[in-house]
């Protein structure tokens, strides 16, 4: 049972203008990546991710097409709750890969809903402070990174 959500006023740090990139192999695009900044004043373990939903151009991205990268390791979203040894520092981006065959060059409306459990704020057993790390922004697809 979570408490109310805490949201700091720094959405521009979550989805920066250069965050959306094409992900290509020799045969062509296989998807895209999205870099996500942490809108909080402390780092958190990756297992603190309670909910991650991505919508691009009003189309929800299915969970099975997403991999999350942190510290050089890849995780399906279903395994994030077990990634308690992986720490997400505030100055490092979380990278999401979406393997959907790619998207067109140009601007895209990106809506991220990312809810985090604040592991430093446990009010009672199973009752945590929650952080709303969500953001919406129009991003232009960049070349491969």
State each model region's role:
Residues 1-145:
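Terminal leader/tail segments of proteins
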């Amino acid at each position: 049972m979570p408490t109310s959500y805490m949201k700091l006023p720094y959405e521009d740090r979550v989805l920066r203008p250069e965050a959306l990139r094409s992900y290509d192999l020799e045969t062509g695009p296989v998807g895209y990546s999205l870099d996500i900044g942490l809108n909080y004043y402390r780092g958190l373990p990756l297992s603190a991710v309670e909910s991650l939903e991505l919508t691009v151009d009003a189309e929800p991205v299915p969970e099975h097409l997403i991999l999350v990268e942190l510290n050089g390791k890849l995780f399906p979203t279903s395994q994030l709750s077990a990634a308690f040894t992986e720490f997400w520092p505030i100055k490092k981006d979380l990278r999401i890969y979406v393997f959907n065959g790619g998207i067109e060059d140009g601007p895209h409306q990106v809506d991220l809903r990312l809810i985090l459990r604040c592991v430093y704020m446990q009010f009672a057993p199973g009752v945590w402070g929650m952080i709303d790390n969500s953001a919406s922004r129009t991003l232009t697809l960049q070349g491969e990174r």
